[in-house]
Regions:
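Short, glycine/serine-rich, charged loops/turns that create anion-binding
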Residues: 14, 61, 268
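Residue-level marker of positions within ordered structural domains that often coincide
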Residues: 9, 59, 92, 121, ...
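Bacterial N-terminal signal peptides
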Residues: 8-18
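Active-site nucleophile-adjacent alpha helix/oxyanion-hole segment immediately C-terminal to the catalytic cysteine
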Residues: 28-263, 375-377
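Boundary at the C-terminal end of the N-terminal hydrophobic targeting segment
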Residues: 19-23
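Bacterial N-terminal signal peptides that target proteins for export
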Residues: 1-8
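Short, flexible coil/linker elements and helix-boundary hinge sites characteristic
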Residues: 16, 71-72, 411
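Active-site signature of cysteine proteases
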Residues: 172-413
Length: 413
């Protein structure tokens, strides 16, 4: 996933214009009361901080929940905590090799996809956070701008091939940068008195990356076939099954209600995705009356009607009740249009682990983020079904979490 900071930088640059400021006015939400319908186990909320690594934090959180489910772990004290930076190191190394091989015709950045995590676990294994924290550069939380820039500078220099023949040293030098910032990837380590390699530890956890599938939903490829989603961070070209959006949501619901969590890739640049734990696909057209004569008399679309000017007693004036924002109605066609015109982009990776309803009866997905215990819900977001329908790039889930009818259509055993 590309860093959400890019979007924030654009917001900062444009916020000085009146039109933009009006269009992006903060969305008002009522005081929600959520009732949990289904909630599956997740590990603690982590903090990717100043790094573009949401993809690994979200996907490893998903893997941790899968290990909990597969092994029947009920004691939170025994929940696994895997090393994000082990995966980052392996992924960055392979990406650099491919970048040079393709003469630089490949996206090279900190961003990637959930499937990349499964690929690394399949090829190398996995290690606990306790044996590789990845924090070798003097900060308590990830701050990786320098590392990203140094890696890119090195790999671009190697790609230019100034000697007209690549030396035998460049791969070791590149790996040396990764080791300097993240620490060497352990070849052996001990857990509970037993020695493991990354691969044997993966196997001991009974986690099989080949048991997982990716789903997406776009019309520029045939349904019930696989294709590599055309986003820069999908540098491996991993493929997802293309299904109608109704069936993707049905698969998501089936997974959650049957004890599975889901890795979720989504656009988060909508004004209804807030830093206070909400993800609502707000119909911004309902806010275009701001400052108009209509608003003067009847109030904004998402508030109670305003009283007539000059008739209010300031001492008795009550704050208007904030109602549910109106959401866009998502169709298969609207999803495709927004993907094609870059209104839906590959922004952020998260983990969906539950379903809840608010006091108005609206359905939400419970989402674990990787921005620390921030916001009103301490690192948890509540995403409406409309938001998930409209803004999802893909989901990753266990194949047994799929409805049987969809498994049959895809030929998945």
């Amino acid at each position: 996933m590309r860093s959400f900071r890019i979007f924030l930088a654009v917001v900062s640059a444009l916020a000085g214009t009146t039109a933009f400021a009006q269009a992006q006015a903060p969305v008002q939400f009522p005081e929600y009361q959520f009732t949990v319908v289904k909630e599956n186990p997740v590990t603690s909320v982590k903090n990717q901080h100043r790094s573009g690594t949401c993809w690994v934090f979200s996907a490893l959180g998903f893997v941790e929940s899968e290990v909990i489910r597969i092994n029947g772990i009920t004691d939170p004290a025994q929940y696994p905590d895997f090393s994000e930076m082990f995966v980052v190191s392996k992924s960055y190394y392979e990406r650099g090799i491919k970048y040079v091989r393709l003469d630089g015709c490949l996206g090279f950045s900190a961003g990637s996809e959930a499937d990349d995590v499964l690929d690394v676990i399949r090829d190398y294994g996995i290690v606990p956070q306790s044996v590789m924290s990845g924090m070798n550069y003097g900060t308590e939380l990830p701050v990786q701008g320098e590392m990203d820039a140094v890696l890119k500078g090195f790999i671009e220099a190697a790609t230019k091939n100034p000697n007209r023949k690549l030396t035998t040293a460049w791969k070791n030098a590149y790996k040396g940068i990764l080791d300097a910032y993240l620490g060497p990837c352990p070849e052996k380590f001990t857990v509970d008195g037993k020695e493991y390699t990354p691969a044997s530890y993966r196997d001991a956890l009974q986690f099989n990356p080949d048991d997982y599938v990716s789903l997406t939903s776009f019309t520029h490829h045939p349904f019930y076939t696989k294709f590599a989603i055309e986003v820069c961070d999908n540098w491996r070209g991993d493929e997802a099954w293309n299904v109608p959006i109704d069936e993707l949501v049905e698969a998501l619901d089936n997974a959650v209600m049957n004890g599975y969590t889901v890795a979720w890739g989504s656009d988060v640049s909508e004004p209804g995705f807030t830093r206070n734990g909400m993800a609502v696909l707000v119909n911004t057209e309902a806010k275009q009356t701001a400052g108009s004569d209509q608003e003067r008399w009847v109030g904004p679309a998402f508030d109670k009607p305003a009283a007539k000017p000059g008739k209010k007693d300031a001492k008795k004036e009550a704050k208007p009740e904030v109602k549910q924002p109106v959401e866009f109605v998502v169709t298969q066609e609207s999803r495709q249009e927004e993907f094609d015109n870059k209104q839906t982009t590959d922004d952020h990776g998260m983990q969906i682990y539950g379903i809840a309803n608010d006091q108005f009866g609206r359905k939400y997905y419970m989402v674990k983020n990787s921005w620390g215990e921030s916001g009103k819900y301490k690192g948890i977001w509540y995403a409406t079904e409309a938001f998930v329908r409209g803004k999802s790039i893909d989901i990753v889930l266990h194949k047994d979490a799929l409805p049987q009818a969809l498994k049959d259509k895809l030929g998945i055993k």
